[in-house]
Amino acid sequence: MAAVPPENGVDGDDEREEEEEDEEEEEEEEEEENGDEAEEEPRLKYQRMGGNVPALLSNDAASCIAVAARMIALGTHDGTVRILDLLGNQVKEFRAHTAPVNDINFDTEGEYIGSCSDDGSVVINSLFTDDEKMKFDYHRPMKAISLDPDYTKKQSKRFVAGGLAGHLYMNSKKWFGNKDQVLHSGEGPIHSVKWRGSLIAWANDVGVKVYDTAKDQRVTFIEKPRGSPRPEALLPHLVWQDDTLLVIGWGTSVKIASIKSDQQQTGTFRQIQMSSLTQVDIVASFQTSYYISGIAPFGDSLVILAYIPIEGDGEKEFSSTTTLSRQGNAQRPEIRIVSWNNDELTMDALPVHGFEHYKAKDYSLAHAPFPGSSYAGGQWAAGDEPLYYIVSPKDVVIAKPRDAEDHINWLLQHGFHEKALAAVEASEGRTELIDKVGAGYLDHLIVERKYAEAASLCPKLLRGSASAWERWVFHFAQLRQLPVLVPYMPTDNPRLKDTVYEVALVALATNPSYHKELLSAVKSWPRSVYSALTVISAIEPQLNTSSMTDALKEALAELYVIDGQYQKAFSLYADLLKPEVFDFIEKYSLHEAIRGKVVQLMLLDCKRATVLFIQNRDLIPPSEVVPQLLKAGKNPQVLKAGKKCDSRYYLYLYLHALFEVSHDTGKDFHDMQVELYAEYDTKMLLPFLRSSQHYKLEKAYELCVKKDFLREQVFVLGRMGNAKQALAVIINKLGDIEEAVEFVSMQHDDDLWEELIKQCLNKPEMVGLLLEHTVGNLDPLYIVNMVPNGLEIPRLRDRLVKIVTDYRTETSLRHGCNDILKTDIVNLLVKCFNEARRGVCLSHEDDDSRAKREDNNRSSFSQRMVVDKSLSIKMTEVKSKTRGDTRCCMCFDPVSIRGDTVVVFFCCHAYHETCLMDAAFSNNNHKTTKGSSGYEYSYDNGVDEEEEDEEEDEDGDGDRPGRSRLRCILCTTAAAASAR
């Protein structure tokens, strides 16, 4: 049964707030009033007991109730005790009495039940043994009964009971039957009795007393609250919260008594437990504005069944003992949860059937706090929640603490979706409940138009459900709020359909405010989750429009990369001036694509761009680079970027780098380069003027004059042929006589020397410098003779001494050089002569066969007879000459290498080998004839004589007998004749 909102509010809180209104400021009062209007969450939930209860109470009326661990006992006005299960189904009944049942009580084990009635009887029934029943008649109406908690375990089978007679009986089983012991009497009827452990508490007209069965004596007395209604009209209520805390609700008063005792154990052979009361404290006491029809513990608070008196009726409410009120204007009973300080935590009005006609005593409250129940942090352990039974004549209402799911549902009903979500997460509820709360929370945020907050919660609420994600993506899209959801969309676990991601990206692209989010999504999302071409098609129409932001342009470039359109991507990256564009060019070999992005690349990194242009000058010639740089200031991308563009400086860097690589590639721009060097790098101007042949001299000269570049003027004038004017600049403006001398020396013009001397004669210092630097170029005496008489030349003596010294040094060096030259000439002539004396043996054998033959004969000597390439060439020339009419210089017969071996010398004289050998033999007195040849002959085939002699000495062959060198007979004879 759903809780019914209170009709009268919380009276206690209203009183406290009214007392504080005079002490607080107006703003605080308004906040408190607003707080009062907010509905508090109930602590309990209610439902009517079903089963057989409605049918039973339709013909009878309930009078009392008792609760055990596994069952419920309901007493009725017809004297029947009905045993019900926890769902209200009747399992057993005892027709124990003939009058209304006033009280029922179970033992702790729930095996026995005791009841008392106005017929004066007390009946004890066993719940599991049909024939075990005991009935005791006291002849006066009995109002209260309580079984020994250990009734099942103990043989004494004790119980206490009392009624209108005013006697409190303790009945126990003895050897000869049951016996009653009067524990107390003489203070009016016994209205209530409760037994816990060894303590028995009862209430009479005077107050509440406590009896200790272990010590067999009364231990305390608590006086009846003053002004309480008569007990016959409003019964006192006693509840043991635990073994030491007794809760008393009487009229409008609540007291909580703490009963403490010291236990000592003494004895020698056995232990005897002794109990001595030390203290009874009233730990809590307060008054209520309502009558107490029942009370029970609720964790560290109290549950009170409140009866709201009719205003102005006062004691009239209790003037009649009849059950039904003729007026029929009674208010609903209320369940209130209060702290021990009477701080009201919650209040629920109960829609009990026929409440308009009931009095306070017509209601009762029973609870089932069993041992083992735990209460911590406002929550009971699962299955240990206490149950509360509110009994009226025609109704039994069950109240129990609300669980986490009830709490969550209440929060959802009242719009506290965020708190509901937190509660679900804390309780780790069912998946269905989590989905329900999440969907409700998102719907609530959407209704409140808190789209960003709703989007941020989607990962937590939708978790791994792909269908839920897709549903909410399209829902956000319908609301045109999809851009706020995109940053939270999952790309893995779960992965959504490709269409979902494409719709999201297109939604971002159409709104300039979310272009940055689009860029972030394109960079972070895996390429495989969507089709880049679809998104590209949606973005491309925005190119060159006002909605095309830099972020959208970069996102489009990223999409081009994903789709493999690298040139388009490069174009956008270059326009965006992205530093990584250079690496992008190298990675994808986009050198041809840089043709139209010269300015952008120079703006990014002029040095790196210059290197790139130079390396690819075949693809991007200077004729394309220079015009773009000249128009850099008008480039729309440069203007949009707002960057400073020094186009002339970029031109200087490019043309300078180009000139260093190739002097002629950029020749069309050398005139411009002269201006750029003059502006940015004056040190390079003169080397450039000297190296280049493609600039206009007149224009260069005008620039040098304008900038006052003197040495550059000298060079340009010299190249223009104005040597005298250039010399004048050197002397008159530079004053550098050494440079003037160098300049004149390079011109190779004697008239220019005269001009130099003429311009220096009027300047004594210049004359002195001229004397110092003309040694080796001009005769110093000539200069001295031209000096006018009387001209004072500074440091003339020292300079003359230096001139003479330098002249002597120069003369000595020249003599030494001449001697060296003569020696070199003689040596070279000797070498030439030796070369001319060498002979070459020609025969029909090829060179390789001959070399092999000679190697076999003279292995050591053959290593020195290697014919190099130059010798082979010479031999070829000789062979060509001997193929004509050449004759032997000895026998004058024609020579031919086909039949005979021929020896040819470099003097072009040829001999038959036999003729030459005979002549050599006849001239050698130490050698024998050829027929008895024990000698060997060698030829001057390209080996220097002196070197060969040295080698022979080193090898030990110089003393070998029978070895002689063949020489040209004619040349040798001629040389001998000339020597004579």
From Swiss-Prot:
Region (Disordered): 1-42, 931-964
Annotated Acidic residues bias: 10-40, 942-957
Pfam families linked: Beta-prop_Vps41 (PF23411), TPR_Vps41 (PF23556), zf-RING_Vps41 (PF23555)
Chain positions of WD repeats: 57-95, 96-135, 185-221
GO cellular component terms, semicolon-separated: extracellular region; HOPS complex
Keywords annotated in UniProt: Protein transport, Repeat, Transport, WD repeat
CDD domains associated with the record: RING-H2_Vps8
BP GO annotations: endosomal vesicle fusion; gravitropism; protein targeting to vacuole
First and last residues of every CHCR repeat: 613-769
Xref: Gene3D superfamilies: Tetratricopeptide repeat domain (1.25.40.10), YVTN repeat-like/Quinoprotein amine dehydrogenase (2.130.10.10)
UniProt subunit comment: Component of the homotypic fusion and vacuole protein sorting (HOPS) complex composed of the class C Vps core proteins VPS11, VCL1, VPS18 and VPS33, which in HOPS further associates with VPS39 and VPS41.
Task performed by this protein: Required for vacuolar assembly and vacuolar traffic.
Family annotation (PANTHER family): VACUOLAR PROTEIN SORTING VPS41 (PTHR12616), VACUOLAR PROTEIN SORTING-ASSOCIATED PROTEIN 41 HOMOLOG (PTHR12616:SF1)
Record family assignment: Belongs to the VPS41 family.
Protein name: Vacuolar protein sorting-associated protein 41 homolog
Species of the source: Arabidopsis thaliana (Mouse-ear cress)
The encoding gene: VPS41
